[in-house]
Structures are given as C-alpha cells and as structure tokens.
C-alpha cells in the first residue's frame, strides 16, 4: 500500500515536471487562445491588429521618460513591454500614444488607447469610470535626504523637533501631512517638485517630502547626493486602466501581470525594478501563492 502510494507520488511528481516543462516549451500562444475570448472583446481585436496601443506619458522619471537616445523608458514602459510579450511573444509589439494625465480616462473610454499605463493611482472614484488591473507598484510618501545631512534619518529628523525643516509640494493638506509624521517640524511649501528638491540641494531644508519612487530613483542615480530617510507613509496603489465591461481583456492583462510579478516570466519586471528603483526583487517562494 505504502509502496503503491510512493510510486503514485513519483508518477505525479514526474508528471508535474513534465507539465511544467511542457508549459515552458509549448504553452498556447495568446493568439491561438483568442478564439476562446468573446468576439467583442478587445483581446481578440488587439491580437488581430498585431500590436497593442498603450496610453502613457513621456516627462516623468522614473515612470515614463526619454533616455539619452530619445527612447521611452521607465517602469510604466516596462509594463507595456510585459503586456506586448504576453500578447505576441514580442515585447516591442506596441504603439505608444503619448498623452496628458488629464486624458487618461477619456482616451480609454473613447477607444483611442487599449490600455493606460501611466502611474495611475487606483481609487474608488476612478474605478467608477474605468476598470483597473492588479497593482504593479505600491507608492507612498517618503523623506528624501542627503548623505551628508545633519538629519538624514527619520529618527534624527524627529529628534530635531522644531529645528527640522521639510519641503513639500504646495497643497491644502501638505502641512498637516508632514506634522502627522514630524509634529514640530517647520514646513516649507513650494510650487513645483523641482523646487521642493532644490530646497534640499541648497541646504534650506533637511528633507524633501516626495514620492518613494522619486526617492529611490534619485538615490539610484546619485547615491553621493541623495539618501532615503527610511520612513514612508500613505500607501497608494498604481495599476493600469482599461475600459469597463470587457472581462476577457481585463483578466488577460491581470494574468500577464501576475506571471511577470509573481511567477516565472519576471525578467523584464525585475530588471526595471532595479534599473529605476535600485532594488532587487526577492522573496518569491514555491508553495503558497502570495497574490
């Protein structure tokens, strides 16, 4: 009985390996699978067209910006490569539609683009207008500091009390947001993100309150000039957006993103995460899915 069970398990293990290998070598391409989707689904239309139209921007590093050769790069752009690879086994099979952030939702709903990948925060208001994919990044607010600064860590900033100075982009909740983290800090509100960071560069403040992705990007570019205080708060989810009502298209994109973030086809995602945030992805384990 025990021997039979062991033999049976051996066959299952062997079969499992065989199936996994078969999945790598001979998985059904998306184009062949399109026959299973609804005739009205965008999935079928995109596959028939031969490329996916991606709405994004071009002026916001590290998300979407032009490199020294004029090529669009960034974490959002990497997600477009991932989607194109999932669709056509060709990470270059897409067309970028460059757009203003204000055009993100209109361009989805008018059909100008198939999907928007443009550092779009998921919230309940937007979710009434478009359908969001699974998140591909968790953003937050952080304190960008200097490695030679007197108060480069959050602990030292907190201990500095009213002597600690922080710059932040001007908005109605700016001062309150800082004081929730540093109750006694002096808050310098400025009109542009560039000026917020310039205040740190010039020594007018001890820290600049910016997106965590900005902190990671600048620290990756200039570790001699910028440091991460180690403190972050107010988490926000970034996801891609598609038109509502097309379950086949949404589920396909989700599946492609899941495999890129959590599964085996993670080369593009991992490289982009390191290139633009300076961090290596670790912790993927077999067994219980962390999704």
Enumerate the predicted regions with their spans.
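Extracytoplasmic small-molecule ligand-binding "clamshell" domains
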Residues: 39-116, 128
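Short helix-initiation/N-cap motifs at beta->coil->alpha
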Residues: 94-106, 188-198, 236
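Extended ligand-binding regions for polar small-molecule ligands
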Residues: 36-37, 81-82, 86, 148-149, ...
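Acidic, polar ligand-binding/catalytic clefts
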Residues: 29-30, 81, 85, 93-159, ...
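Periplasmic-binding protein-like
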Residues: 58, 137-148, 212-257, 276-291
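N-terminal export leaders
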Residues: 7-16
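A ligand-binding cleft/hinge motif common to bilobed small-molecule-binding domains
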Residues: 103, 119-129, 180, 197-235
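N-terminal secretory signal peptides
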Residues: 1-7, 20
